[in-house]
């Protein structure tokens, strides 16, 4: 089956919400170096619902069930589809809605809070907020 046939045959995804976990696909040859190279993988939507409602692109963080023994600085634990895993927060990317294959679940509020904290660190937002005297 070609990717185009597979792409056309997938169920229609209607409304996408922050915190939802989707199976999505990427072209294997798009990745270089240490970027994720798998054709299909899981990811959690982290773009805001206001953006998700109107846009056809979503900000997503890939999830993995590999190497769970150690959680690195920009990773956090997850539990999706009855499987333990982790969010690879430093691998954040934007994907088109057409890449989404199926919804598998939703992260808990606690899991999303952990992701938000790591995002603040990755983008140095704590320093920005301190400079603006917002924290």
Give the ranges of each region predicted by the language model.
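Short, charged beta-turn/beta-strand-edge "cap" motif at the junction between a beta-strand
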Residues: 27-31
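C-terminal terminal-subdomain/extension
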Residues: 2-4, 79-135
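Compact nucleic-acid interaction/catalytic patches
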Residues: 34-78
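Short alpha-helix capping/helix-loop boundary micro-motifs
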Residues: 5-10
């Amino acid at each position: 089956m070609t990717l185009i046939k597979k792409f056309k045959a997938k169920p229609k995804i209607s409304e996408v919400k922050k915190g939802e976990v989707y199976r999505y696909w990427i072209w294997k040859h798009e990745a270089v170096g240490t970027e994720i190279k798998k054709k299909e993988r899981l990811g959690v939507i982290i773009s805001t619902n206001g953006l998700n409602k109107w846009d056809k692109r979503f900000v997503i963080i890939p999830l993995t069930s590999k190497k769970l023994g150690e959680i690195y600085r920009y990773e956090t634990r997850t539990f999706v589809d009855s499987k333990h895993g982790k969010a690879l927060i430093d691998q954040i990317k934007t994907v088109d809605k057409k890449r989404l294959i199926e919804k598998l679940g939703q992260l808990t509020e606690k899991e999303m809070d952990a992701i938000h904290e790591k995002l603040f660190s990755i983008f140095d937002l704590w320093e920005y907020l301190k400079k603006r005297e917002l924290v």
